[in-house]
A protein has these predicted regions:
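Conserved cytochrome P450 K-helix/beta-meander segment immediately N-terminal to the heme-binding cysteine loop
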Residues: 195, 312-340
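Conserved cytochrome P450 K-helix E-x-x-R motif and the immediately C-terminal K′/meander segment
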Residues: 1-9, 176, 180, 259-300, ...
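Cytochrome P450 catalytic-core helices
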Residues: 117, 225-252
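N-terminal membrane-proximal hinge/A-helix region immediately C-terminal to the signal-anchor transmembrane segment
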Residues: 1-69, 88-96, 170, 295, ...
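Cytochrome P450 heme-thiolate monooxygenase catalytic core
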Residues: 42-48, 66, 82-231
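Conserved, non-catalytic sequence blocks in retroelement Pol enzymes and Pol-derived host proteins
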Residues: 80-83, 185, 263-270
Length: 340
């Protein structure tokens, strides 16, 4: 991306997935597209060409009034009281899983973390899956992985043996699974995310349809384990490479005098918060965002015709020396109050 920036600047053309795209680099170009003041860009068409067949209906793939309607319902699922309950349930499950780890020279943290976050997502967010066999749960987990991996498929047709085909099959598996358990979640309200989505409503009394619940469960469970895995594994890497920060974070954690911190106590881990922000800067879990122009428009005074796909690249901005001194250096203090 640096070479592209040096040669072409903020806005340039390239080809991806058999389509012509515009790359929007730097904070000004990114801001113009994301603020979308003239409503020239849409999320749905941009993301759909990459992940639409597997995650359609997720909030990230919705636009305008429909996005607003569903977001107003969705925000009721993430109130502070609900998040506090989720933390209380996650703590013992995480502790139990970590006790089973056997680190060694060949231990692959990313693989173990991905299994952990996926297990937590399926076991806790779905509130268990009564009546299913272990093989059925394994097939659901595999379906999630297949859907995520399908987004990077080179062959984007239903060809047997390809990632794309496995992703399409995975989406169908997930839809069938959630549809099977949805009536039970509708009939009885519990604290798991699946049940919450079945019962929450907006301030005006609007609720999700059955199809919307299924779409959101598939998207949220993907997001819950994929981005979390990337972030935590990055933090493990940099803490391992920077023992002074590892010691600082460990001391803060031990000072809480509990292995199951509450939602409020997590706010006291200031050092870990700085480390997380710096890791999100260095290795963005979502390095690019997709949009599509629905009318002729401009990005930083460059003409962009209707129908153009746009790749917004925050990851590049995260590494620009104009804004981040020594951008490749791990420096969590850059997010501290005295440095802002």
């Amino acid at each position: 991306m640096q070479k592209r920036w040096d040669r072409y600047g903020e806005v340039s053309w390239f080809s991806m997935a058999g389509r012509r795209w515009v790359a929007a680099l730097g904070p000004d170009a990114c801001q113009e597209v994301l603020q979308n003041k003239d409503r020239a860009f849409v999320n749905s068409d941009g993301w759909s060409v990459l992940i639409g067949p597997f995650f359609h209906g997720g909030l990230m793939l919705l636009d305008s009034e429909e996005h607003l309607r569903q977001r107003r319902i969705m925000q009721q699922a993430f109130t502070r009281s609900r998040l506090e309950k989720t933390v209380d349930v996650l703590n013992p499950a995480i502790a139990s899983a970590l006790d089973a780890w056997t680190p060694s020279d060949g231990f692959r943290a990313y693989t173990a973390l991905k299994a952990l976050t996926l297990n937590l997502a399926t076991d806790i967010f779905m509130g268990g899956a009564e009546g299913t066999t272990e093989s059925e749960i394994d097939s659901v987990k595999k379906a999630f992985v297949d859907c995520v991996q399908a987004a990077t498929s080179v062959i984007r047709y239903r060809v047997p043996g390809t990632r794309w085909k496995r992703g399409l099959d995975g989406r169908r598996t997930l839809e069938n699974f959630f549809r099977r358990y949805l009536p039970a979640r509708r009939s009885r309200e519990t604290d798991d995310l699946f049940s919450v989505l079945c019962h929450i409503e907006s301030d005006t009394g609007q609720r999700f349809s059955d199809g919307e619940v299924i779409d959101h469960m598939i998207f949220l469970l993907m997001a819950a384990h994929d981005t979390s895995t990337i972030t935590i594994s990055t933090m493990m890497q940099y803490l391992g490479q920077n023992p002074q920060w590892q010691n600082r974070c460990r001391a803060e954690s031990l000072a809480l005098s509990t292995s199951t911190p509450s939602y409020a106590e997590l706010d006291q881990l200031a050092g870990l918060d700085l480390v997380m922000k710096e890791c999100l800067r260095l290795v963005a879990p979502v390095p690019v965002m997709a949009r599509r122009a629905v009318c002729d428009t401009q990005i930083q005074d460059h003409f962009v015709p209707a129908g153009t796909y746009v790749s917004v690249v925050p990851h590049f901005t995260h590494h620009m020396p104009q804004y981040w001194p020594d951008p490749e250096h791990f420096d969590p203090e850059r997010f501290a109050d005295h440095r802002r």
